[in-house]
């Protein structure tokens, strides 16, 4: 069949897609803080990088700030899922805020490893994107001794003060393949470097990228639901494009362009780890309106991981125990 003669037929859904355990936990922390203490609740940085999620929480009474000086004395403050530096933690405590830490436990694992190895005299090479809040939080665990590399070329430029005790850590939301390539370059220059006991890139990032690798060759176009600030969503689009599939990232269904689907039969659809399923369903509805007949979910890994909530948020304002489950935003369908 001529490409021009192709008509929209089928939507293939990546599995898994959308919310991960760390995002679900972070959103639920804000929701429960609002339930227990009432609005406003202050959140340093966007709780997760998704426009819809942030706007929904704003409507419930969350106020998102970057500077702690914008938070009134005695207020309740939540740290975002990306983590914060030691300096931010210390300042928040000094200002007397009631603090709930929504840092993803997998990011916290990296922070703990950095602190442990630093005491043993290690310097660090961090693979990540300059300016990303997770990178700033991890590098801010120490006053010095962490060298950021964004690509292979950066590996040749860094100048650790010693190489006998050197360890690698990575941003959790990177491209798995890119991180492996940079890690190999680090190992080639510093053969004795200590690599992570377990890969820092999180299970959800790995699973969503693996799903795109399976999905991309089977479709004519791939749509990623995610906000521009979402690192892991951007990596999904880049991965599909690298595999030779036309790929676009949209914040929501309103950003879809009819021209993208001309001459296309099969549409692949996935979502970054901070994008709620309601946005995926809206995109499906829009693509159906353009002519797609069926929707099929691909086989994939079922994620069952749940991260515990802070103890102070397992009860409501009256001291009644709250059920631990998915956030309200996760339940939206």
Swiss-Prot record:
Any GO molecular function: 4 iron, 4 sulfur cluster binding
Entry binding sites for isopentenyl diphosphate: 49, 82, 132, 230-232, 274
Biological process (GO), any one: terpenoid biosynthetic process
InterPro entries the UniProt entry points to: LytB/IspH
Catalytic activity: isopentenyl diphosphate + 2 oxidized [2Fe-2S]-[ferredoxin] + H2O = (2E)-4-hydroxy-3-methylbut-2-enyl diphosphate + 2 reduced [2Fe-2S]-[ferredoxin] + 2 H(+); dimethylallyl diphosphate + 2 oxidized [2Fe-2S]-[ferredoxin] + H2O = (2E)-4-hydroxy-3-methylbut-2-enyl diphosphate + 2 reduced [2Fe-2S]-[ferredoxin] + 2 H(+)
Family: Belongs to the IspH family.
Record function comment: Catalyzes the conversion of 1-hydroxy-2-methyl-2-(E)-butenyl 4-diphosphate (HMBPP) into a mixture of isopentenyl diphosphate (IPP) and dimethylallyl diphosphate (DMAPP). Acts in the terminal step of the DOXP/MEP pathway for isoprenoid precursor biosynthesis.
Name used for this protein in its record: 4-hydroxy-3-methylbut-2-enyl diphosphate reductase
Source organism of the structure: Polaromonas sp. (strain JS666 / ATCC BAA-500)
């Amino acid at each position: 069949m001529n490409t021009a003669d192709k008509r929209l037929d089928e939507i293939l859904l990546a599995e898994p897609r959308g919310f991960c355990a760390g995002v679900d936990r972070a959103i639920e922390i804000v929701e429960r803080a609002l339930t227990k203490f009432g609005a406003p609740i202050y959140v340093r940085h966007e709780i997760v990088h998704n426009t819809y999620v942030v706007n929904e929480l704003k409507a419930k009474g969350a106020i998102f700030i970057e500077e702690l000086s914008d938070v009134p004395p005695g207020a309740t403050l939540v740290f975002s899922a990306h983590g914060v530096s030691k300096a931010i933690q210390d300042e928040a405590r000094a200002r007397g805020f009631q603090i709930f830490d929504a840092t993803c436990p997998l990011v916290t694992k990296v922070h703990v490893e950095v602190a442990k190895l630093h005491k043993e005299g290690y310097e660090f090479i961090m693979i990540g994107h300059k300016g990303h809040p997770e990178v700033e939080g991890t590098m801010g665990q120490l006053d010095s001794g962490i060298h950021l590399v964004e690509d292979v070329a950066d590996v040749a430029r860094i100048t650790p003060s010693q190489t006998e005790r050197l360890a690698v850590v990575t941003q959790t939301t990177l491209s798995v393949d890119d991180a492996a390539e940079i890690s190999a370059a680090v190992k080639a220059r510093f053969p004795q470097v200590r690599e992570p006991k377990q890969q820092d890139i999180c299970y959800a990032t790995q699973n969503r990228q693996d799903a795109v690798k399976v999905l991309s060759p089977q479709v004519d176009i791939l749509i990623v639901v995610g906000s521009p600030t979402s690192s892991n969503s951007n990596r999904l689009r880049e991965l599909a494009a690298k595999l030779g599939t036309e790929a676009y990232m949209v914040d929501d269904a309103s950003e879809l362009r009819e021209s993208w689907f001309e001459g296309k039969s099969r549409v692949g659809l996935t979502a970054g780890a901070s994008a709620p399923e309601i946005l995926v369903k809206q995109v499906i509805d829009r693509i159906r309106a353009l002519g797609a007949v069926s929707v099929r979910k691909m086989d994939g890994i079922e994620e069952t991981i749940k991260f515990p909530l802070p103890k102070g948020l397992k009860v409501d304002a009256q001291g009644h125990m709250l059920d631990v489950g998915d956030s309200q935003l996760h339940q939206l369908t």
